[in-house]
Every structure is written in C-alpha cells, then in structure tokens.
Design a protein with these regions (language model features):
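N-terminal amphipathic/basic leader segments beginning at the initiator methionine
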Residues: 2-49
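Gly-rich Lys/Arg/Thr-decorated short loops/hinges at beta-loop-alpha junctions or inter-strand turns
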Residues: 12-21, 52-59, 89-101, 118
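Electropositive phosphate-/nucleotide-binding environments in soluble metabolic enzymes
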Residues: 26-30, 34, 48, 65-73, ...
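Glycine-rich oxoanion-binding loops at beta->alpha junctions
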Residues: 32-40, 80-128
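Fold-independent oxyanion-binding glycine-rich loops
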Residues: 40, 56-58, 71, 89-92, ...
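Glycine-rich phosphate/diphosphate-binding loop of Rossmann-like nucleotide-binding domains
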Residues: 44-48, 52-53, 59-88
Length: 161
C-alpha cells in the first residue's frame, strides 16, 4: 500500500477532519460527514474529540470471541474517560472449524479488510479486539500496515462446551 504521509508543513488533521471524501470542497465534505454521524446522536463537542476506532471480530460463528461485547464496552469507557470518542466497527471474523475450505486465506483477507477500514475511516488510533490463531495475526498484520497507532487486545480464553 502507498504511504499516506503528509508532504506539506500543515498540521495533521485529526478526528472527523482527516481523510475527507474528495468532493472538491473540504467544507462540504466535512458538513456531509457531520450530518450523517449526528444522526447517531453525537454532539458537536463529542465530534471535536480525537477518534479512537474499536474494531472487533465478534460473530455467532466464532465461539472464541463470545466475550467481545463486554470487552468493547470496557474499552469504550476507558476511551471516553481519556476524552476521546470511541467508534466501533466490525471486520471479518474467522474460526477454524467454520471456515471452508481453510481459514488461512481468510486470514489474509481479514488483514486487508482491517487495514483498509482503519485507513478509510477518520480515526486517530485504533484498538483491535480479536482472538484465535488467525484473527490475531491478521490484526497484527493490519496494524503494521495501516500507519495508525494501534493496540491489539486479545479476547482471552474461550469457554469450552
């Protein structure tokens, strides 16, 4: 992937102001972005904060990740306490016994999906919540390539049936 480094001396845009869609008018692009996100109930104050994305691999097909909803809520609380805005988004979820023909090629697809979602969304950093032997490597690969500060949070042990 090509690096998206700044070439000018201008300060780096943060929060919702970064990575605006190219409509030819940055003000209009920001207006559209805010109009849509405000429909989710966010205030102007919240939208002026740094954004921390929280990506996760929760799926009913993936018993390894059964505690992900609780982890998401804990991470969101911590981010809010630090004055940032947490925004949650999903990525592909892989479980070995539910993947046909094999989960290995899905690992690479998940890495690309996660990297591109992190790059495409206006976030200042990201917390990646996942587990198992394919999703964690995919998230680490994405974190290494996405050029955003990232924390990978393993889900911990899976409950047995």
């Amino acid at each position: 992937m090509a690096s998206r480094k700044r070439t000018s001396g201008a300060p780096k845009a943060t929060g919702l102001r970064q990575g605006l869609a190219t409509y030819g008018d940055a003000g209009f692009s920001l207006f559209l972005r805010k109009a849509f996100i405000k429909a989710a109930g966010y205030t102007d104050d919240a939208l002026d904060r740094p954004i921390v994305g929280i990506t996760n691999t929760f799926s009913d097909f993936n018993p390894c990740h059964g505690n992900v909803p609780d982890l998401i809520e804990s991470v969101k609380r911590g981010i809010l306490l630090q004055g940032a805005l947490p925004l949650v988004f999903p990525t592909i979820s892989i479980h070995e016994s539910f993947s046909h023909p094999t989960s290995m090629y899905l690992r690479n697809l998940m890495a690309m999906d996660t990297e591109e979602m992190v790059r495409a969304q206006p976030m200042d950093s990201v917390v990646m919540i996942g587990g198992c032997d394919k999703t964690l490597p995919a998230q680490i690969m994405a974190a290494a390539s996405a050029d955003h500060p990232a924390i990978v949070l393993p889900v911990g042990p899976m409950l047995v049936g």
